[in-house]
Regions:
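Conserved N-terminal beta1-alpha1 strand-loop-helix module at the mouth
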Residues: 1-78, 86, 114-119, 164-165, ...
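Conserved beta-strand positions in the central sheet of alpha/beta enzyme cores
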Residues: 4, 30-31, 56-58, 78-80, ...
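Short loop-to-alpha-helix "cap/lid" segments that border enzyme active sites
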Residues: 44-50, 83-169
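Glycine-rich phosphate-binding active-site loops on the catalytic face of alpha/beta enzymes
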Residues: 79-87, 123-135, 172-195
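Bateman (tandem CBS) regulatory domains
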Residues: 204-219, 274-285
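The conserved cystathionine-beta-synthase
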Residues: 220-240, 246-247, 265, 287-308, ...
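Short hydrophobic beta-strand motif reused across regulatory alpha/beta modules
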Residues: 254-259, 321-329
Length: 334
């Protein structure tokens, strides 16, 4: 996951010094907020003289067309428009360079992206726009999951309230880039803050249930209702690479993954018609309680001698309530 440093969050030092410091720490992107202020492009022109680091511009304006010529003169690498500010359909000239995104606040549903399907990414504002240092609103975890499901090939960027713990969760959910401002510049050093945003050892206050994929969004089978073939079909149709297998009351019996299916087929290669549920189901998967913290999750993973791609989440009486899907972590690191 890329870290996009919000350059105007450092209000104490000259811009040139901020840019030099960020480059010395090899930050991935420079995040530039333009709140209907054309003079920002003077700064962009200066930054281009000092650095080759990609520029991530967030344009907050009712009249984006007023900035098209400035964007032609000062092309940026990432260009985001704030949805709530737009008063008319956004018609972007084809010669405007850079990857395009649309930004939404916490209260705006991700469904609006259907009007911008040609764009490359969505930027989810996880705190109140313009308020530096706000707390991450955990409702945005659900929005990220929904957007990932609706637009699996699009990138997700997040701005606001991202600390070390939230950063780990976002990486796990496949977020491509996060904007960091006050957290980055209020730390004892930029280097320490960057380490906190990218390291695997973190403090934790969020629980697994805050960011897991809930059971009602997972492929689910019931052992007494489904044959082995039907379970394989559920895995295939679910497009997540697994299915939870439950009892009538919702208690977890096991999990069937694509890897488990391959093992079952190899086991009964000469008599495929004899494959039954027990041949393809892992009846003792690694699970975690919904009330566990991120730190407890990491400690559990460290005890494993095998790679963990899926981890069912259960409640205190063993009922399946969701799953942690580590496949998205790979997307977030690309």
């Amino acid at each position: 996951m890329k870290i996009s440093a919000s350059i105007y969050s450092d209000k104490l030092r000259p811009l040139a010094e901020v840019i030099q410091d960020l480059d010395a720490h090899q930050v991935d992107l420079f995040h530039v907020d333009c709140n209907d202020d054309p003079s920002v492009f003077t700064d962009i022109a200066e930054i281009r003289k000092w650095s080759t680091t990609p520029i991530d511009l967030h344009l907050i304006t009712e009249k984006p067309e007023a900035y098209f010529e400035l964007l032609r003169e000062n092309p940026v690498d990432y260009l985001t428009f704030q949805f709530e500010k737009l008063k008319a359909p956004l018609r972007l000239p084809k010669d405007i360079q850079g990857k395009k995104g649309i930004a939404i606040t916490t209260d705006t549903p991700v469904d609006i992206f259907q009007g911008f399907s040609e764009f490359d990414f969505i930027l989810i504002m996880a705190t109140t726009p313009g308020q530096s240092g706000g707390k991450f609103d955990q409702h945005n975890f659900q929005k990220i999951r929904k957007f990932r499901k609706m637009y699996p090939t699009k990138s997700i960027h997040v701005d606001g309230g991202v600390n070390g713990e939230v950063s780990f969760i976002l990486r796990n959910m496949g977020v491509s880039s996060c904007v960091s401002g006050s957290y980055l510049f209020n730390a004892p050093s930029i280097g320490q803050a960057l380490m906190n945003l990218t390291k695997r050892e973190i403090e934790s206050s969020f629980q697994i249930k805050d960011f897991m994929v809930p059971a009602d969004e997972c492929p689910v089978c019931y052992s007494h209702l489904h044959s082995a073939k039907e379970i394989v079909q559920v895995v295939d149709q679910g497009k997540l690479g697994f299915a939870l297998v439950l009892k009538d009351d919702g208690k977890l019996i096991g999990i069937v993954s694509s890897a488990d299916i391959r093992k079952g087929v190899l086991k009964k290669w000469d008599e495929p018609q004899q494959i039954n549920i027990s041949d393809i189901m892992n009846t003792s998967p690694l699970t975690i309680l919904e009330t566990a913290t991120v730190v407890e999750l990491l400690k559990l993973i460290k005890t494993c001698s095998f790679p963990v791609m899926y981890m069912p989440v259960v409640n205190s009486i063993g009922h399946a309530v969701g799953i942690i899907n580590f496949a998205h972590l790979i997307k977030g690191e690309i």
